[in-house]
Curated annotation (Swiss-Prot):
Organism expressing this protein natively: Acholeplasma laidlawii (strain PG-8A)
Originating gene: asnS
Gene3D superfamilies assigned to the protein according to its UniProt record, in alphabetical order: Bira Bifunctional Protein, Domain 2 (3.30.930.10), Nucleic acid-binding proteins (2.40.50.140)
Protein name: Asparagine--tRNA ligase
Domain of life: Bacteria
GO CC list: cytoplasm
Record keywords, A-Z: Aminoacyl-tRNA synthetase, ATP-binding, Cytoplasm, Ligase, Nucleotide-binding, Protein biosynthesis
Catalytic activity, as annotated: tRNA(Asn) + L-asparagine + ATP = L-asparaginyl-tRNA(Asn) + AMP + diphosphate + H(+)
Molecular function terms from GO: asparagine-tRNA ligase activity; ATP binding; nucleic acid binding
Chief place of localization: cytoplasm
Phylogenetic placement of the source organism: Bacteria, Bacillati, Mycoplasmatota, Mollicutes, Acholeplasmatales
Residues spanning the membrane: none
Complex and partners: Homodimer.
Compartments in which it is found: Cytoplasm
Length: 463
């Protein structure tokens, strides 16, 4: 009977005493004179299964003793329940067949490796416990995001990766060109003549799908995007990467309060789904990565997210008598230490900070009646700070044009965006959730390089 380890863990009693066949990779191997133990993992489940082989009962015993860590094998044996031992069951091997050998220089040996070293062998690191857990949770969380929106009849929109938009201040962009940059065509002023390029104008990798998402919200009402975005920022921090994934919903006929309700429901839904469907992985993170992680996430699910204005947030910080490295100021952004104080000291839970100063926010955010703030919101969570950023969009054409003028946003390039206001425009709201930022929060793994399969960072594109 050809089985997976996951199938056996679901109902070991069903297969007790039966001959089974398993295929997988050796995680650990201990051999002795008359018997030996192999920890086998087949990728279907976080836990390994122990294979016991003996000289008296296992075919080609001596050959089995020479099998290396990392080798792929097929095991034929009997499943035996072992309730009195540390593992609930094991396989008594009748035969162990080598599928693919692994040399002595295999980098992933059964010992502790630094995360820095494992980034250098990113093609092999999912074979470790840590990264097996990380990337299964990544898969489960991604599915949960789609499930959340699909259950509420949101339309999934594939926004373009190649774009003529410059992101309007969202971040430095990667240019895409087919021109020979050693001899590019020039205009009279010596600037590069992009009319000779593939698209006939400058093109970039996208930093956001929001603007295109707004277009589809004006047709389908509720939409979401979930795809890769790119930032050419030369930043080597634990939270920055040049390629990452964003979830960007957009809802029509909706104001900022509707937006905050959607954010809270989505974060709780996805977190609850991960806790339910990745129990072994989450227990591993709680034990070995971030002590108290499960308690933190349980508190998130039970809490009601507080809502305060940016002005109220600054006042709380100023009255706290806490010594901050960066003094909080009205009209300015919140630093990470401010975010953590609000969530961990002031409110002991998640906090929405809304109504931000217009001068530090994007042109498309709706201007409030005070003419000083915009209908923007950030969700702050304990331990991580900002998790989500969003806003109600400016639906009034005249106000939007004035904001674009004040912020020196080229109207000509975004005339199509203005059409959304000219032809049946409505209130829309939306937000952006950096998928990797969420994974950092939910796993406790602190570096963005360790929650992306093949991280892209400055001077690093090995794979």
């Amino acid at each position: 009977m050809d089985l997976t380890i996951r199938t056996i863990y679901k109902d070991p009693a069903r297969y007790a005493g039966q001959e089974v066949i398993l295929k997988g990779w050796i995680r650990n191997h201990r051999d002795q004179k008359e018997f030996g133990f192999i920890n086998l993992n087949d990728g279907s489940f976080f836990e390994n299964i122990q294979v016991v082989y003996e000289r008296a009962t296992t075919k080609d015993f001596d050959a089995v003793t020479r099998l290396s860590v990392g080798a792929s094998i097929e095991v034929i044996g009997t499943l035996v329940l072992t309730p009195d031992r540390s593992q609930p069951f094991e396989i008594k091997a009748l035969e162990v067949r080598l599928i693919g050998d692994s040399g002595e220089n295999y980098p992933i040996q059964p010992k502790r490796h630094t995360r820095e070293f494992l980034r250098e062998v990113a093609h092999l690191r999912p074979r470790t416990n840590l990264f097996s857990a990380v990337f299964r949770v990544r898969s489960i969380a991604a599915y949960a995001i789609h499930k959340f929106f699909q259950e509420q009849d949101f339309v999934y929109v594939h926004t373009p990766i190649l774009t003529a938009n410059d992101g309007e201040g969202a971040g430095a962009m990667f240019k895409v060109t087919t021109l020979d940059m050693n001899k590019p065509p020039r205009n009279e002023d010596s600037s590069i003549d992009y009319s000779k390029d593939f698209f006939g104008r400058e093109a970039n990798l996208t930093v956001t799908g929001q603007l295109e998402g707004e277009a589809y919200a004006h047709a389908f009402r509720n939409i979401y995007t979930f795809g890769p975005t790119f930032r050419a920022e030369n930043s080597n921090t634990t939270t920055h990467a040049s390629e990452f994934w964003m979830i960007e919903p957009e809802i029509a006929f909706a104001d900022l309060n509707d937006n905050m309700e959607l954010i809270e429901r989505m974060v709780k839904y996805v977190t609850s789904y991960v806790l339910e469907h990745a129990k072994e992985e989450m227990a591993f993170f709680d034990k070995f990565v971030e002590k108290g992680l499960l308690t933190k996430l349980d508190n998130l699910l039970k809490s009601s997210f507080k809502r305060i204005t940016h002005e109220e947030a600054i006042n709380i910080l100023l009255k706290s008598n806490h010594k901050f490295e960066n003094q909080p100021k009205h009209g300015e952004d919140l630093a990470k230490e401010h975010e953590r104080y609000l969530t961990e000291k002031a409110f002991h839970g998640p906090v929405f900070v809304k109504d931000w100063p217009k001068d530090i926010k994007a042109f498309y955010m709706r201007l409030n009646d005070d003419q000083k703030t915009v209908a923007a919101v950030d969700l702050l969570v304990p331990g991580s700070g900002e998790l989500v950023g969003g806003s109600q969009r400016e639906e009034r054409l005249d106000v939007l044009l004035k904001r674009m003028e004040d912020m020196h946003v080229p109207v000509k390039d975004l005339d199509w965006y203005l059409d959304l206001r000219r032809y049946g425009g409505v209130q829309t709201s939306g937000f952006g959730l950096g998928f990797e930022r969420y994974l950092i929060y939910v796993t406790g793994v602190e570096n963005i390089r360790d929650v992306i399969p093949f991280p892209r960072t400055p001077k690093n594109i090995l794979f």
